[in-house]
Amino acid sequence: MSAKTDEILEQLKSLSLLEASELVKQIEDAFGVSAAAPAGGMMMPMAMPGAPGAAAAEPEEEQTEFDAILTEFPSDKKIAILKVVRSITGLGLKEAKELVESVPKPLKEGIAKEAAEDIKKQLEEAGAKVEIK
């Protein structure tokens, strides 16, 4: 690596979680990109367009990784949902609030079906609507 990239890497290592989160948002805004992984991104390389039988083979494979996505919530239940989101994700209050306010947003990605169902149950009990993909 060049000296410039080494210096940038060292500066990134020194950032707090909050600063890193703010940096990601600024990069997303500046370059018009999203740091969120696309839903089902792991499955895309398996089926190549034009490959014979690619479409037929895909439905037979059982999905093993799921995403729990917070889709909506009533505003009067926001505090209860924030508490559940913080306990599930381990995020700080500000990060959890930003996540909840930017629905629909994945809370956890690439998790087992049981874990996704548990997250869905907890959030629905708090009043939120959750999708599992």
Swiss-Prot record:
GO terms for molecular function: mRNA binding; structural constituent of ribosome. It comes from the Bacteria. Transmembrane segments: none annotated. Keywords: Ribonucleoprotein, Ribosomal protein. GO terms for cellular component: cytosolic large ribosomal subunit. One of its GO terms (biological process) is translation. InterPro entries: Ribosomal_bL12 (IPR000206), Ribosomal_bL12_C (IPR013823), Ribosomal_bL12_C/ClpS-like (IPR014719), Ribosomal_bL12_oligo (IPR008932), Ribosomal_bL12_oligo_N_sf (IPR036235). Gene3D superfamilies: 3.30.1390.10, Single helix bin. NCBIfam families: L12. Homodimer. Part of the ribosomal stalk of the 50S ribosomal subunit. Forms a multimeric L10(L12)X complex, where L10 forms an elongated spine to which 2 to 4 L12 dimers bind in a sequential fashion. Binds GTP-bound translation factors. Forms part of the ribosomal stalk which helps the ribosome interact with GTP-bound translation factors. Is thus essential for accurate translation. Belongs to the bacterial ribosomal protein bL12 family. This is Large ribosomal subunit protein bL12. It comes from Trichodesmium erythraeum (strain IMS101).
